[in-house]
Amino acid sequence: MIVRNIDEIIGTENETKAKTWTSRRMLLRKDKMGFSFHETIIYAGTETHIHYQNHLEAVYCVAGDGEIETIKDGKVYPIKDGTMYALNENDEHYLRGGKEDMRLICVFNPAVVGPETHDEEGVYPLLDDNGKRIK
C-alpha cells in the first residue's frame, strides 16, 4: 500500500514549478500503478499553452476557478470546484487561472517520471526511468 501526505511532497524533487503552475506529483511511474497522480496549482490570472501529445490527462477541480479553451475550435469551458475535464484526444488547449488560484487533481497515462515540464510546444516529453528524453 502507498500512503502519502502532500506535506511530504512540497519542497522535494516531486514538486515541479513553472511560471504559471506548481505540480506536486504524488504517484509516479516508479510506483508502478500505471498512471501518475498530481495536485496542480494554476496561478490566478495566468495562461498556459498545453498540448499533451504523449499523455492522456483527466483533471478534477477541487478549489478556485479558471477556464480551458480548446485551440482547434475555440470553445471555452469554465472551471470551478467540482468540474472535471478529460483530454481524451490529446486536445491542444489554453488553461487559464481565474480570480484565485485553481487547485486541480490530475491523472496522467502513461505515468510521468517526475521532472516533466511543458516544452515550447506545450508538450510533456516521454522520459525513460532515469529522466532522459525518449520522445
Predicted segments, located by residue:
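Short beta-strand His + acidic residue motifs that chelate non-heme Fe in jelly-roll/DSBH
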Residues: T48-I50, I68-E69, L87, E92-K99
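A short, N-terminal "cap"/entry segment at the start of jelly-roll beta-barrel domains
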Residues: M1-F35, T117-K135
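Short acidic-glycine-tyrosine-enriched beta hairpin
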Residues: D73-E89
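Short strand-connecting beta-turns/loops that link adjacent beta-strands
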Residues: D31-M33, D73, E100-D101
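A short hydrophobic beta-strand segment most commonly corresponding to one strand
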Residues: A58, A86, E100-E116
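Conserved short histidine dyad/triad with adjacent acidic residue
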Residues: F37-Q53
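Glycine- and acidic-residue-biased ligand/ion/polar-headgroup-sensing regions
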Residues: N54-G66
